[in-house]
């Protein structure tokens, strides 16, 4: 009743957006599910909020990261096995971010089975910047994961996350406070690898999820998939990737530095035999048509 807001499990980047708005003389209007006397915790202070409107029904939230394992194809399983053995294991990838598609869901489900067979437990996939994917549960329950910092929540995962405060960032109130701003920062500077599916790749290795008949959201991929130069803490995987960088001497001279490993998963042909590898990305024509 004092205007303080509890955004809870799916806090994401709301406090950062509200703060930026309020401290630039903007107006903040909050639509809330319920007005109460006391909150479990304060995610946004009341003096940053100008108006509060109680909604007649809870705001609709759609599950974004839940993938039905029955829909994972044999090709996606094969790609996952290739990635685990040939990339994760080869480089010793411990800190990473996964995309949200079926390709990485397959990898997550393969960790406690195929990954265990390869003897990689404790050597890879210990620390994630990741939303609470249900497909991570087997790996968490079998002791693969040390920590997961989340951009946001996932419908239906709040109770599981609260029960695993040893893995997720859970507060004294018993619920997680996701933080997209912190996750993007950590994903930009601190992880060894980003891996995710894509729709088109050109001869230069440029990748795009925008095609002539489909523009898919890319989330944090451009951020996670870049190679930041301001890394503060080195790792074996980061240094190994840097050693293999073909133009490192021309770029860096004698400096011994690493490089972000970026992996894009694609099939030679997609649905209706649309090619995954193309001479020119559809994104160029889309950008031209949109006057971008």
Segments from the language model and where they lie:
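Conserved phosphate- and dinucleotide-binding cores of soluble alpha/beta proteins
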Residues: 1-98, 102-126, 130, 134-292
């Amino acid at each position: 009743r004092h205007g303080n807001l509890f955004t809870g499990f799916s806090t994401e980047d709301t406090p950062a957006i509200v703060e930026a708005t309020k401290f630039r003389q903007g107006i903040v209007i909050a639509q809330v599910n319920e007005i109460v006397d006391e909150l479990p915790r304060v995610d946004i202070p009341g003096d940053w909020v100008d108006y509060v409107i109680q909604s007649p029904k809870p705001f609709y939230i759609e599950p974004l990261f839940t993938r039905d394992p029955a829909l994972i194809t044999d090709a996606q399983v094969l790609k996952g096995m290739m990635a685990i053995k040939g990339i994760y294991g080869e480089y010793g990838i411990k800190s990473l971010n996964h995309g949200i598609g079926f390709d990485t869901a397959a990898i997550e489900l393969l960790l406690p089975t195929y990954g265990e067979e390869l003897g990689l437990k404790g050597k890879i996939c210990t620390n994630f910047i990741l939303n609470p994917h249900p497909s991570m549960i087997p790996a968490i329950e079998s002791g693969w994961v040390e920590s997961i910092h989340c951009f946001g929540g996932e419908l239906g995962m709040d109770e599981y996350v609260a029960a695993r405060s040893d893995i997720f960032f859970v507060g004294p109130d018993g619920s997680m406070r996701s933080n997209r701003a912190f996750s993007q920062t950590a994903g930009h500077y601190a992880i060894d690898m980003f891996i995710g599916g894509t729709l088109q790749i050109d001869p230069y290795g440029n990748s795009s999820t925008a095609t002539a008949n489909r523009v898919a959201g890319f989330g944090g991929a451009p951020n996670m998939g870049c190679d930041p130069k301001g890394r503060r803490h080195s790792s074996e995987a980061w240094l190994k990737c840097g050693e293999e960088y073909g133009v490192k001497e021309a770029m860096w001279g004698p400096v011994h530095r690493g490089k972000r490993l970026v992996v894009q998963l694609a099939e030679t042909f997609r649905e209706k035999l649309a090619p995954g590898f193309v001479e020119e990305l559809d994104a160029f024509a889309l950008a031209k048509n949109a006057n971008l």
